[in-house]
Amino acid sequence: MGIKFLEVIKPFCAVLPEIQKPERKIQFREKVLWTAITLFIFLVCCQIPLFGIMSSDSADPFYWMRVILASNRGTLMELGISPIVTSGLIMQLLAGAKIIEVGDTPKDRALFNGAQKLFGMIITIGQSIVYVMTGMYGDPSEMGAGICLLIIIQLFVAGLIVLLLDELLQKGYGLGSGISLFIATNICETIVWKAFSPTTVNTGRGTEFEGAIIALFHLLATRTDKVRALREAFYRQNLPNLLNLIATVFVFAVVIYFQGFRVDLPIKSARYRGQYNTYPIKLFYTSNIPIILQSALVSNLYVISQMLSTRFSGNFLVNLLGTWSDTSTGGPARAYPVGGLCYFLSPPESFGSVLDDPIHAAIYIVFMLGSCAFFSKTWIEVSGSSAKDVAKQLKEQQMVMGGHRETSMVHELNRYIPTAAAFGGLCIGGLSVMADFLGAIGSGTGILLAVTIIYQYFEIFVKEQSEMGSMGALLF
């Protein structure tokens, strides 16, 4: 059934725009250039406003998810990476549940990736229609069918650009993946902005700067009571404070520390005697994939809940899914869940919120740990990183594990890889929860993603440099 499904969508995949694989080896300097161009296009799209919108000043229903999904409200990057990640989530769940079967052949892998891209484009259209029809840019009846269609086309073209930029990097023209690059850029930009933002906000305490560090110097300069000024800089509510900044740095350090945890399995060449090596199985075996997929799941749940709340306010089942409230305290207007399933799947705002509603905190912890472990375990089956796939790769390289025959390698790898995937997913979820409870800037999920992505790029740079043999190749 699975192969038939992939064969059915094959004609549709053939007409999709595609980036061709490079016919030659792309040099490191070229990869850096293409990565910079990709990032530049993304950042430009983040600043170009959508043409035709009447208003985007209403409460932002996806404020909490924008950092993670690399989206920017009212611009071409309104959807961010949400369509790509959502399509990946759907295809992974279908493959993990054996509803579709993905073989080991390059043909099946290519069809699977094509199906993911096709679903990504369909989801882009669907999300664009939902955003417009729910009144995010103004009343659709007042805007008219022409303007509504124009906004949908803009969002679709922008979504297609993101898909192709991601594919450009994944095909080997650049470094890493577009998804990772866009997420890390967005999160780091948010952290820097929250620390140094010169924007002023009117609060009950008077006019204050949004940036935590700028606010520290401003409070020390304007307050006569310096001790009180310091206390306010560390603990002020509804705006970034120094405690949030310290928590962010602490979480960065903890995640980098855990990145070094791994088990090295001894392997040796079956062809050449005396040639030994190790195969590392990291604690974060699936890296940040579990947290990305978990974010996609929650964001789509938010979209559905917001849409239903707008159309069927007061309905019991809709309220069971989620009830929402608007706030503009200490920043832009935003909507946040105050009841229903969406409330329990959203992180507590602070450690004080944990004490106020421990049931909410407990359900959130269980959801984060369980979903990250589940996505981590299922991801290895569809991404070519399971014990069977690794054993096949070692066999192709004519490498065997010390003290084991080729036939027993899969059994030995099965002792480590599924455990590393599940436990690594649990750790990722646990660290994300810890960062949320500490009040880290950019959310716990965002910090986890930023650190793991930056570490991935560090490893890519080290690998490229080792292949070139010297640091000199970094310079023109």
Swiss-Prot record:
Main location: endoplasmic reticulum
GO cellular component: endoplasmic reticulum membrane
Any Pfam family: SecY
SUPFAM superfamilies with a match to the protein in the record: Preprotein translocase SecY subunit
Superkingdom in the source lineage: Eukaryota
Sequence ranges on the Cytoplasmic membrane side: 2-33, 97-117, 166-172, 262-288, 376-420, 463-476
GO BP term, pick one: protein transport
Disulfides per UniProt: none
Residue spans, topological domain Lumenal: 54-76, 139-144, 194-240, 310-354, 442-445
Gene3D superfamilies for the chain: SecY subunit domain
Membrane topology designation: Multi-pass membrane protein
Transmembrane segments: 34-53, 77-96, 118-138, 145-165, 173-193, 241-261, 289-309, 355-375, 421-441, 446-462
Keyword line: Developmental protein, Endoplasmic reticulum, Membrane, Protein transport, Translocation, Transmembrane, Transmembrane helix, Transport
Subcellular location, record wording: Endoplasmic reticulum membrane
Assembly information from the UniProt record: The SEC61 channel-forming translocon complex consists of channel-forming core components SEC61A1, SEC61B and SEC61G and different auxiliary components such as SEC62 and SEC63. The SEC61 channel associates with the multi-pass translocon (MPT) complex.
Family as reported in the entry's similarity comment: Belongs to the SecY/SEC61-alpha family.
Biological function: Component of SEC61 channel-forming translocon complex that mediates transport of signal peptide-containing precursor polypeptides across the endoplasmic reticulum (ER). Forms a ribosome receptor and a gated pore in the ER membrane, both functions required for cotranslational translocation of nascent polypeptides. May cooperate with auxiliary protein SEC62, SEC63 and HSPA5/BiP to enable post-translational transport of small presecretory proteins.
NCBIfam families for this protein: 3a0501s007, PRK08568.1-5
Name under which the protein is recorded: Protein transport protein Sec61 subunit alpha isoform A
